[in-house]
């Protein structure tokens, strides 16, 4: 369980497990009633929000995704997908999430067929 208070943040990172392939996840358990004043961009709210950062380049590629957050939302993404959480302000309430990771035993040679 991760708890964040105002002005705290979780910098961009990835997860690893015992295997090369795996999944990370986050479930939203509690959100503050406000994330406070936006300092970076009023039109795109970022305070206290999860941002998933892709590795794609190109004119039609979306390099990041900021999912809408509601209580009990559950997001699953690959281990090696960078992600971060921005700080929030203006409240003493807590942002609480549950994070979980799991290895995926995948063999690309054995799993090539369309069986």
Regions found by a protein language model. Name each.
Residues 2-76, 84-86, 93-94, 108-113:
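Catalytic core of non-heme Fe(II) oxygenases with the double-stranded beta-helix
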Residues 80-81, 103:
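Short, surface-exposed secondary-structure boundary micro-motifs
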Residues 91-102:
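A short alpha/beta connector and helix-capping loop motif
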